[in-house]
């Protein structure tokens, strides 16, 4: 992993491996050097109070998060909310407050950014609230929320989308001090 990739970790939670959210994430990864994790390629089980799911991939991702200075969560907007993959992933952060407090504490002061991608220009009010409150609870810095959209996975097929994604890239670079 390069120094930039260690600084930025981009985590994608989408049902479509070749979807619009993945397209935005790949564009940003290419432009910023961010490491990219696609939750659809991993096995991450639901949170359970008995912690029977410790053999899945969640803790590997959690360790990578502790190595990053900036964590970017990218999710499509499904039914006015984050994807099921992203919600399951966030629910598992509860493990970082119980059985792996050592990892959870290492997230303090890291920057957390949310990217959403949908088929309209703005998602509903309050879309970012769960991520903002998660950042607060984990003592992380919520560093921004950006929404964009794509048509047929073409970042530059639409002038408005191009402007939005370029603004997002510039904002991410500003957040990481590039």
Predicted regions, residues:
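Short, charged/polar "capping" segments at the starts of alpha-helices
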Residues: 123-124, 153-156
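Short, glycine-/small-residue-rich phosphate/pyrophosphate-handling segment
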Residues: 106-145
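Short glycine-rich catalytic loops that host catalytic nucleophiles or stabilize transition states
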Residues: 38-41, 146-150
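N-terminal beta1-alpha1-beta2 submodule of the flavodoxin-like/Rossmannoid cofactor-binding fold
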Residues: 1-103, 155, 159-178
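Short, glycine/serine-rich, charged loops/turns that create anion-binding
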Residues: 15-16, 119-120, 150
């Amino acid at each position: 992993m390069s120094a930039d990739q260690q600084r930025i970790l981009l985590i994608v939670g989408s049902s479509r491996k070749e979807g619009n959210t993945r397209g935005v994430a790949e564009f940003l990864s290419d432009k910023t050097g961010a490491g990219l994790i696609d939750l659809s390629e991993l096995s991450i089980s639901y949170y359970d109070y008995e912690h029977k799911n410790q053999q899945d991939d969640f803790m590997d991702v959690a360790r990578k998060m502790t190595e990053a200075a900036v964590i970017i969560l990218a999710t499509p907007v499904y039914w006015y909310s984050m994807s099921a993959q992203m919600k399951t992933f966030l629910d598992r952060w509860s493990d970082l407050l119980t059985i792996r407090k050592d990892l959870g504490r290492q997230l303090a002061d890291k920057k957390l950014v949310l990217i959403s991608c949908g088929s309209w220009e703005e998602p509903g009010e309050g879309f970012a609230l769960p991520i903002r409150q998660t950042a607060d609870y984990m003592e992380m810095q919520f560093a921004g929320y950006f929404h964009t959209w794509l048509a047929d996975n073409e970042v530059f097929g639409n002038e408005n989308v191009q402007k939005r994604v370029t603004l997002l890239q510039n904002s991410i670079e500003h957040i990481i001090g590039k």
